């Protein structure tokens, strides 16, 4: 929760985030603001016509118009400042300064209440960072909040449902995650959005790892690698999970002989190297602790997921 040091912002619990979003929901006032400004302009114009022949009051309409222009200018400036702050939060999240970004996004939720688009982007940042920090129950709250405000068949809603399924799987609620994934799989397979298909493939990989179905995961390893490409650097998580599956089979598969186990181990190393070229090993393990056996030597990633705070 909030701290005087932005790098020490503690991620909220699911209950804290739910309460924060309930207290500061988005409010669509765009139409009201537009009609209010129009009414003020009409009032100023009418006042000008009424007082145009009154020397003592001739300047009042002009002053009213200047005041209206100042108000509209202030509103536009505030909107630009909020837009810049939201963009900055995204930039911080992309360079993995998670706690600083999370603290700023937390403050933006009430600040952006009257700007639904910016409000939604701030909540999206919160959901993303909570997932990266392994706070999956809280991430589910954020994803659920966003889903409730989109049509069920909206492309973004489908992606949010996939991410929520991943959060459920990572928090150990395998049945809930499996059910959520089955519900979205049909729509994802018929979608022309490659990112959505890649997200579903990633979710299935997470599911295979958490249920111990390593052989199923590697049976289509090459297709999975290709399918993950639209995710950009986040494909590294998929490469890491595939590497883990090969690693476990190289050590535990009773049907594999020594040469086969060596091949499995080599494939695991190649995939892990590919993953760590995109995302630091410590960050991969922080997001998916199951990957810890792939660290050489095994270390505690809790202190290295983010760059050191600037002095």
Regions found by a protein language model. Give the residues of each.
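Cytosolic juxtamembrane N-terminal segments of multi-pass membrane proteins
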Residues: 1-31
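Transmembrane-cytosolic junction motif
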Residues: 27-29, 67-96
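Structural motif corresponding to the intra-repeat A-B loop/turn of tetratricopeptide repeats
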Residues: 95, 133, 171, 211, ...
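Amphipathic alpha-helical segments of tetratricopeptide repeats
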Residues: 106-111, 144-150, 182-190, 222-230, ...
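Hydrophobic alpha-helical transmembrane segments
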Residues: 50-65
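"A position-specific structural signal for the A-helix of alpha-solenoid helical repeats
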Residues: 83, 87, 118-125, 156, ...
């Amino acid at each position: 929760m909030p701290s005087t040091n932005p790098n020490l912002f503690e991620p909220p619990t699911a209950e804290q985030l739910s309460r924060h979003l309930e207290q500061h929901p988005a409010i669509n006032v765009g139409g009201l603001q537009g009609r209010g400004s129009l009414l003020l302009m009409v009032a100023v114009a009418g006042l000008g016509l009424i007082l145009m022949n009154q020397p003592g009051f001739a300047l009042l309409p002009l002053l009213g118009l200047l005041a209206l222009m100042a108000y509209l200018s202030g509103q536009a400036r505030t909107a630009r400042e909020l837009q810049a702050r939201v963009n900055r939060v995204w930039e911080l999240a992309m360079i993995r300064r998670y706690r600083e970004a999370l603290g700023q996004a937390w403050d933006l939720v009430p600040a952006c209440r009257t700007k639904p688009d910016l409000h939604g982007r701030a909540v999206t940042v919160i959901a993303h960072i909570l997932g990266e920090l392994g706070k999956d129950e809280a991430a589910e709250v954020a994803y659920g909040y966003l889903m409730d405000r989109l049509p069920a068949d909206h492309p973004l809603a489908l992606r949010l449902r996939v991410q929520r399924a991943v959060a459920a799987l990572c928090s150990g609620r395998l049945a809930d995650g499996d059910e959520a994934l089955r519900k979205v799989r049909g729509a994802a397979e018929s979608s022309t959005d490659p990112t959505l298909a890649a997200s579903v493939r990633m979710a299935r990989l997470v599911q295979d790892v958490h249920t111990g179905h390593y052989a199923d995961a590697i049976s289509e390893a090459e297709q999975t690698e290709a399918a993950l490409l639209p995710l950009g650097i986040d494909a590294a998580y998929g490469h890491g999970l595939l590497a883990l599956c090969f690693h476990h089979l190289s050590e535990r598969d009773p049907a594999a002989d020594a040469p086969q186990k060596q091949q499995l181990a080599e494939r695991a190393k190649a995939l892990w190297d590919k993953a760590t070229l995109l995302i630091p090993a410590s960050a991969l393990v922080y997001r998916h602790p199951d990957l810890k056996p792939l660290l050489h030597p095994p270390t505690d990633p809790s202190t290295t997921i983010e760059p050191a705070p600037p002095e």
